[in-house]
Protein backbone atom coordinates (compact mmCIF):
# COMPACT_ATOMS: atom_id res chain seq x y z
CA UNK A 1 0.00 0.00 0.00
CA UNK A 2 1.36 3.40 -1.01
CA UNK A 3 1.18 6.17 1.58
CA UNK A 4 -0.06 9.59 0.49
CA UNK A 5 2.63 12.24 0.64
CA UNK A 6 -0.06 14.92 0.89
CA UNK A 7 -1.13 15.55 4.46
CA UNK A 8 -4.84 14.82 4.47
CA UNK A 9 -7.41 13.64 6.97
CA UNK A 10 -10.44 11.46 6.32
CA UNK A 11 -13.46 11.23 8.62
CA UNK A 12 -16.99 9.85 8.53
CA UNK A 13 -20.20 11.50 9.70
CA UNK A 14 -23.64 9.92 10.05
CA UNK A 15 -27.20 11.18 10.54
CA UNK A 16 -30.28 8.94 10.26
CA UNK A 17 -29.60 6.88 7.11
CA UNK A 18 -27.07 9.32 5.59
CA UNK A 19 -23.37 8.43 5.68
CA UNK A 20 -20.81 11.00 4.59
CA UNK A 21 -17.07 10.52 4.09
CA UNK A 22 -15.07 13.76 4.10
CA UNK A 23 -11.49 14.02 2.82
CA UNK A 24 -9.71 17.23 3.87
CA UNK A 25 -6.45 18.24 2.18
CA UNK A 26 -4.49 21.49 1.74
CA UNK A 27 -5.51 23.38 -1.38
CA UNK A 28 -7.37 26.33 -2.82
CA UNK A 29 -10.92 25.83 -1.53
CA UNK A 30 -12.27 23.43 -4.18
CA UNK A 31 -15.19 21.33 -2.90
CA UNK A 32 -16.31 18.18 -4.72
CA UNK A 33 -19.47 16.30 -3.65
CA UNK A 34 -20.09 12.91 -5.32
CA UNK A 35 -18.31 14.14 -8.45
CA UNK A 36 -20.39 17.33 -8.67
CA UNK A 37 -19.69 20.93 -7.74
CA UNK A 38 -20.62 21.93 -4.17
CA UNK A 39 -23.15 24.55 -5.36
CA UNK A 40 -24.74 22.05 -7.73
CA UNK A 41 -25.23 19.30 -5.14
CA UNK A 42 -26.40 21.65 -2.37
CA UNK A 43 -28.28 24.47 -4.15
CA UNK A 44 -29.54 26.25 -1.00
CA UNK A 45 -27.26 28.77 0.72
CA UNK A 46 -28.34 27.64 4.22
CA UNK A 47 -27.19 24.08 3.44
CA UNK A 48 -23.76 25.26 2.29
CA UNK A 49 -23.36 27.56 5.31
CA UNK A 50 -24.33 24.71 7.68
CA UNK A 51 -21.78 22.34 6.14
CA UNK A 52 -18.91 24.84 6.12
CA UNK A 53 -19.60 26.25 9.62
CA UNK A 54 -16.94 24.09 11.39
CA UNK A 55 -14.37 25.20 8.81
CA UNK A 56 -15.27 28.86 9.30
CA UNK A 57 -15.12 28.60 13.12
CA UNK A 58 -11.69 26.93 13.19
CA UNK A 59 -9.84 28.41 10.20
CA UNK A 60 -11.92 31.53 9.53
CA UNK A 61 -11.80 30.86 5.78
CA UNK A 62 -12.72 28.15 3.27
CA UNK A 63 -9.86 28.90 0.82
CA UNK A 64 -7.06 27.03 2.63
CA UNK A 65 -8.14 23.44 1.97
CA UNK A 66 -9.90 21.25 -0.59
CA UNK A 67 -12.76 18.94 0.33
CA UNK A 68 -13.73 15.69 -1.36
CA UNK A 69 -17.07 14.48 -0.02
CA UNK A 70 -18.82 11.16 -0.70
CA UNK A 71 -22.41 10.81 0.54
CA UNK A 72 -24.70 7.77 0.54
CA UNK A 73 -28.33 7.42 1.63
CA UNK A 74 -30.71 9.62 3.56
CA UNK A 75 -32.43 12.85 2.62
CA UNK A 76 -30.89 16.22 1.89
CA UNK A 77 -30.99 17.53 5.47
CA UNK A 78 -29.59 14.29 6.89
CA UNK A 79 -26.78 14.48 4.33
CA UNK A 80 -26.04 18.09 5.32
CA UNK A 81 -25.71 17.25 9.03
CA UNK A 82 -23.74 14.05 8.31
CA UNK A 83 -21.30 16.04 6.15
CA UNK A 84 -20.93 18.73 8.82
CA UNK A 85 -20.07 16.07 11.42
CA UNK A 86 -17.58 14.42 9.04
CA UNK A 87 -15.91 17.77 8.33
CA UNK A 88 -15.67 18.58 12.05
CA UNK A 89 -14.08 15.18 12.74
CA UNK A 90 -11.62 15.64 9.86
CA UNK A 91 -10.65 19.07 11.22
CA UNK A 92 -10.17 17.53 14.67
CA UNK A 93 -7.77 14.92 13.24
CA UNK A 94 -5.78 17.66 11.52
CA UNK A 95 -5.83 20.18 14.39
CA UNK A 96 -6.29 18.68 17.88
CA UNK A 97 -6.22 22.14 19.51
CA UNK A 98 -9.59 22.98 17.93
CA UNK A 99 -11.48 20.31 19.94
CA UNK A 100 -12.80 22.70 22.60
CA UNK A 101 -14.07 25.19 20.01
CA UNK A 102 -15.73 22.51 17.87
CA UNK A 103 -17.30 20.86 20.92
CA UNK A 104 -18.65 24.15 22.32
CA UNK A 105 -20.52 24.81 19.06
CA UNK A 106 -21.92 21.25 19.02
CA UNK A 107 -20.16 20.17 15.82
CA UNK A 108 -18.77 16.95 17.32
CA UNK A 109 -22.11 15.68 18.65
CA UNK A 110 -23.67 12.82 16.70
CA UNK A 111 -27.49 13.08 16.65
CA UNK A 112 -28.66 9.61 17.79
CA UNK A 113 -32.30 9.97 16.70
CA UNK A 114 -33.47 7.46 14.10
CA UNK A 115 -36.80 6.55 12.54
CA UNK A 116 -38.95 4.59 14.97
CA UNK A 117 -40.10 1.23 13.64
CA UNK A 118 -43.72 0.53 12.75
CA UNK A 119 -45.56 -1.63 15.28
CA UNK A 120 -48.09 -4.30 14.34
CA UNK A 121 -51.69 -3.34 15.11
CA UNK A 122 -50.83 0.28 14.32
CA UNK A 123 -50.86 2.32 11.12
CA UNK A 124 -47.43 3.82 11.79
CA UNK A 125 -44.96 3.82 14.67
CA UNK A 126 -47.40 5.43 17.10
CA UNK A 127 -50.55 6.21 15.08
CA UNK A 128 -53.34 3.68 15.63
CA UNK A 129 -56.15 2.63 13.33
CA UNK A 130 -59.42 4.53 13.80
CA UNK A 131 -61.25 3.28 16.89
CA UNK A 132 -64.91 2.38 16.50
CA UNK A 133 -67.00 1.82 19.59
CA UNK A 134 -69.74 -0.03 17.70
UniProtKB/Swiss-Prot annotation:
| GO CC annotations on file | cytosolic small ribosomal subunit
User: Biased composition, Basic residues: where in the chain?
Assistant: 115-134
Give the residue ranges for region: Disordered. Answer: 98-134
Query: Entry's SUPFAM superfamilies?
Result: Ribosomal protein S5 domain 2-like
Instruction: Output the superkingdom of the source species.
Output: Bacteria
- Keyword Ligase attached: no
| Any single biological process term in GO | translation
Per UniProt, what is one GO molecular function of this protein?
structural constituent of ribosome
| Keyword annotations of the record | Ribonucleoprotein, Ribosomal protein
Q: Which HAMAP family match?
A: Ribosomal_uS9_B (MF_00532_B)
Q: Which family does it belong to?
A: Belongs to the universal ribosomal protein uS9 family.
- Please state what the protein is called: Small ribosomal subunit protein uS9
The species is Chlamydia caviae (strain ATCC VR-813 / DSM 19441 / 03DC25 / GPIC)
Encoded by which gene? rpsI
Amino acid sequence: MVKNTIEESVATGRRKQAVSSVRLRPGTGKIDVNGKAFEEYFPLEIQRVTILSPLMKVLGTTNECDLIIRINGGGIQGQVIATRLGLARALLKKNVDSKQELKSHGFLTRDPRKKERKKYGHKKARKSFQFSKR
